[in-house]
């Protein structure tokens, strides 16, 4: 009986009354592979080791969004991308406030994303420094987040599933379809870049270890560096040069340069 119901639902969404048009995403495999840059960039810091689980979850949410989008559930896909960024914010907040972890696990209130961002901007020196030195990066991110929220909150007919079927008769369907794909690809790239940047608020090793001079003076870290291609596509070299001006990066660099090169 359950199998029959499942088959009926699948048929309804594939060809029947509730048909959802799937989206072609030629770069899906590339995005999935690129996310590995974040999962491999684990921090070894004892007081921030728990952040690894949060960044793994953020990466999972991005991967989920890519799958959901290709299946046609674009609003859920946009929501997953928004969540990937909020999860990253959450771990920065908890790393700065470890005493609040038990309350977070107990599902107590006070962990809304907006409140956590406000706290970090006003009280967490590393977070403040990064945002101050990379204003354009975060301004662009905010612009894309606002667009994402229109899909999540279903504002405007372009965020409706039914709009695609209603527009078929006047030949607007493909235009709407292409616009959703364009917006999603812009958002998935922004989400990957944002999560990667928030990871750099824990420690700068994913960037430090990209520098051969610094890498040869470094100890054996569990952290893997970001690839050149990853940085170029999702963060931008201009932004990385600005990031290198942060106190966090400079302190690590100075400490590592004090060590001799290793064979």
Regions found by a protein language model. Give the residues of each.
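A cross-kingdom marker of C-terminal helix-rich interaction/assembly modules
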Residues: 1-74, 79, 91, 101-263
């Amino acid at each position: 009986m359950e199998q029959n119901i499942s088959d009926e639902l699948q048929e309804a969404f594939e060809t029947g009354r509730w048909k959802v048009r799937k989206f072609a995403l030629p770069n899906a495999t590339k995005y999935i592979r690129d996310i590995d840059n974040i999962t491999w960039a684990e921090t070894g810091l004892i007081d921030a080791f728990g952040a690894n689980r949060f960044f793994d979850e953020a990466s999972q949410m991005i991967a989920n969004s890519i799958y959901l989008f290709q299946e046609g559930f674009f609003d859920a896909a946009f929501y997953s991308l928004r969540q990937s960024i909020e999860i990253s914010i959450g771990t920065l907040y908890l790393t700065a406030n470890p005493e609040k972890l038990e309350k977070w696990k107990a599902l107590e209130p006070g962990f809304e994303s907006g409140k956590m961002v406000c706290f970090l901007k006003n009280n967490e020196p590393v977070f403040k420094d990064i945002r101050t030195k990379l204003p354009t990066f975060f301004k662009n991110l905010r612009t894309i987040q606002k667009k994402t929220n229109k899909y999540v909150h279903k504002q405007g007919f372009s965020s409706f599933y039914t709009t695609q079927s209603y527009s078929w008769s006047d030949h607007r369907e493909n235009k709407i379809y292409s616009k959703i794909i364009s917006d999603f690809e812009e958002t998935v790239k922004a989400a990957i870049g944002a999560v990667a940047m928030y990871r750099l608020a824990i420690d700068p090793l994913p960037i430090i270890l990209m520098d051969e001079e610094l890498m040869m003076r470094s100890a054996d870290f569990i952290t893997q560096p970001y690839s050149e291609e990853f940085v170029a596509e999702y963060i931008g070299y201009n932004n990385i040069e600005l990031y290198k001006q942060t106190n966090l990066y400079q302190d690590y660099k100075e400490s590592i340069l004090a060590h001799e090169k290793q064979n």
